Swiss-Prot record:
Signal sequence interval, chain numbering: 1-31
Protein species of origin: Limosilactobacillus reuteri (strain DSM 20016)
Encoding gene per record: cbiM
InterPro entries: CbiM (IPR018024), CbiM/NikMN (IPR002751)
Pfam families, alphabetized: CbiM
Top-level taxon of the source organism: Bacteria
GO biological-process terms attached to the record: cobalamin biosynthetic process
Protein name per Swiss-Prot or TrEMBL: Cobalt transport protein CbiM
Keyword Glycoprotein: no
Disulfide bonds: none
Entry's transmembrane regions: 39-59, 75-95, 107-127, 139-159, 173-195, 213-233
Family the entry assigns: Belongs to the CbiM family.
């Protein structure tokens, strides 16, 4: 454990700085994490019900990983959770009083597969909702579905497709993280559009409006997230702390 900490002391320092910053300057978010009270009760219940099977499967995957005996598995789980927390807490102003931020789910998706991200994501979402006024409890199901279910599944599909096509590991990982981020925001835009349809154009028009709002900041953020994810992943692999596809 001490060897791992020494090798990753710079990255751990970065994570701690991000943690201190987010705790010291909590800001209310109204973008990818749908805020408390934003959704009607029936939709809150619906998204909880839809997300529950994925969460249960994620618990099963988490149990298998923790008891797998694979070296550094627990450390890598903690790293992936911290990566999601720090990146998803780095909020940037967007339009109409909202904000945008990375999701950070690409790293864990590639290391462990999309299933475990539903559990890690819920832990992060609960922490942010309770301590950082970021998201909410009633909207937890909707936020979980977009960020920790759809995002990782899309990212994992992109990763597997790229690797099957013999695309380089770094490019595959970059595309995985980027598309996981974008698909999260597309899902959130759809979740809001069906609740707040445009008076004239309906759900389709509302979806276009929400997507156009998020795209201003989220497109460059997703690209930056992809690059950072590649750097961290290559750091992990190059130091022999993990093997590709070890527990996917």
């Amino acid at each position: 454990m001490l060897k791992v900490i020494k090798k990753y002391r710079k990255f751990i320092t970065f994570l701690m700085i991000g943690l201190v910053y987010t705790l010291a300057y909590p800001a209310t978010a109204h973008a990818m994490h749908i805020m408390e009270g934003m959704l009607p009760p029936r939709w809150c219940i619906f998204w909880y019900a839809v997300s529950l099977p994925f969460f249960i499967y994620g618990l099963y995957r988490m149990y298998k990983i923790v008891n797998s005996g694979v070296p550094n598995a627990k450390v890598m789980l903690a790293l992936c959770g911290a990566f999601v927390f720090v990146l998803s807490s780095l909020k940037l102003p967007s339009v109409t009083g909202s904000c945008s931020h990375p999701t950070g789910v690409g790293l864990g998706t590639v290391l462990f597969g999309p299933g475990v991200m539903s559990v890690l994501g819920v832990i992060v979402l609960l922490f942010q909702a309770l301590l950082l006024a970021h998201g909410g409890i009633t909207t937890l199901g909707a936020n979980e579905f977009s960020m920790t279910i759809v995002g990782p599944i899309v990212g994992y599909a992109v990763w597997k497709l790229c690797r099957a096509m013999k695309v380089s590991r770094s490019v595959s990982l970059f595309l995985c993280a980027m598309f996981a981020d974008w698909s999260t925001y597309v899902t959130t835009a759809f979740q809001l559009a069906i609740v707040f349809p445009d008076p004239n154009g309906g759900v389709a028009a509302a979806l276009i409006k929400f997507l156009s709002i998020y795209a201003i900041t989220q497109i460059p953020l997703a690209i930056a997230e992809g690059l950072l994810t590649v750097i961290v992943y290559n750091l992990v692999i190059s130091n022999d702390l993990w093997k590709e596809s070890a527990l996917q």
